[in-house]
Amino acid sequence: MIALLPFILSLAATFINIFLCVTNISKRYSINLNILFWVIIFISFFIVRSNFSNDFLMDFATPFISLDEFSFCFGVVLSALMIIFLISSFYSDDEKFYKQEMFALASLAGFGLLAMSLSVELILTLIFLEVASISIYAMIAMNSIEYKSVEAAFKYFLLSSFMSAFYLLGAAFVFGVAGSTKYSFIATGLNSDFLSIIGMILVLSMMFFKIAIFGFYRWSIDVYYGSNLNIAGFLASAFKLASFAILIKLCFLYPGNNIEILQGIFAILAILSMFAGNLLSLKETNVKKILIAAGIVHSGYIFINLSSVGASVSIYPAIFYLSTYTIVVGFLFAILNGLFGDREIKISDLNGLYKVRPTEAFAFTVICLSFIGFPYSVGFLGKLFIFSSAVESGKTYLAIFGIINTIFSVYYYLKIIISIYFSENKTALSCADSKKFGLKLLALSSILFIILEGSGIFSIISFLNLFIR
């Protein structure tokens, strides 16, 4: 029973939050309680991994849920992202939005994403994905005073419904050929015929949609922009992490006969995503939209490694980049939420930020430099691993395209940094003085993570490997 401890604890936290909806619990106590829940869930992963071998956890209790090394890594990072999301909720003055119902939905979404990353079966994966998605629709729409939030929720719901139908059709094709919907059976049961390839593409298209890769990204601009800033950060970090987790497990933990065909598709998506994301970012002046479009570029970087995995190249660069990128994005949206609340943020709103909030301004700068790939930052290390994997696999052209797009991204990230340090401040910040200290701690945490991880003093993957036996 202890091997399923993280799964059970996250489910219990969800039920407790639902029961608390009928009480008059304050926002402060609700946030503190949920942070405690997710800290316990975070610790439970290490308890489980320390007490059981990998072979035992791969086959424990159920053929549908597995706490392998990949699930362990993604589960730990997802728990950390939930904690960052909850801490960020402290710094919003919108009491009507941050009601207990919102935290119950957030807990349900966290459970769905966590369970999804543990799943090794197609139908169960979709069920947990829908649990998380339905919660997100409601969380986006809860900001009902904003017309764009209701529009964003409806658009996300409608498009997700279509993609779920495609996923189920693909799962039916896969079952018809492989005779099972378990990942391990799919890997050995599928062949290179037309039905197998179409089935896998339809299944993976759902993940492409949630990740917002090229061809599936148009929704993300409107939905993220129409969402509360904190919810947008949750989508850009936790939801993207869980979607990539399924993609990686399905394609690489259980590699099948069609992996070469899929990797060719991944290479095309990587190139198109990097260029499309940069083109969208270059013309934007809205900070949230820049970050949304830049997320498409970073997904493209991860796809470089996914298209390069082979005998001499591991999936490690993609896992490292995904884990560190989503944590940094979580920190960034949390800091922005603390500084500006839920109002629209133009680049000009960052003018002279260093004069009034030097710690947060420096954190914002370090994050932007990390996204560029500045040396001794975690972004530099991630890009080094990603581009090296492409070269080692013989796909040097992908590394070249990646470097070109990294150079393009310098323009809009430097635009933000220049605005912070070389322009006069004209806009009041929303964070109250009483909340400055906590926000500074959040900013300092992001700086330490980026520098310590990037300089090699601390490695999240090496640390997690200590618990993998």
From Swiss-Prot:
It is found in: Cell inner membrane. InterPro entries: NADH-Q_OxRdtase_suN/2, ND/Mrp_TM. The keyword Transmembrane helix applies. GO terms for molecular function: NADH dehydrogenase (ubiquinone) activity; NADH:ubiquinone reductase (non-electrogenic) activity; quinone binding. The keyword Translocase applies. Its EC number is 7.1.1.-. The chain crosses the membrane at residues 2-22, 28-48, 70-90, 101-121, 122-142, 157-177, 194-214, 233-253, 261-281, 290-310, 315-335, 361-381, 398-418, 447-467. It comes from the Bacteria. It is a multi-pass membrane protein. It holds the Pfam family Proton_antipo_M. GO terms for biological process: ATP synthesis coupled electron transport. One of its GO terms (cellular component) is plasma membrane. NDH-1 shuttles electrons from NADH, via FMN and iron-sulfur (Fe-S) centers, to quinones in the respiratory chain. The immediate electron acceptor for the enzyme in this species is believed to be ubiquinone. Couples the redox reaction to proton translocation (for every two electrons transferred, four hydrogen ions are translocated across the cytoplasmic membrane), and thus conserves the redox energy in a proton gradient. Belongs to the complex I subunit 2 family. This is NADH-quinone oxidoreductase subunit N.
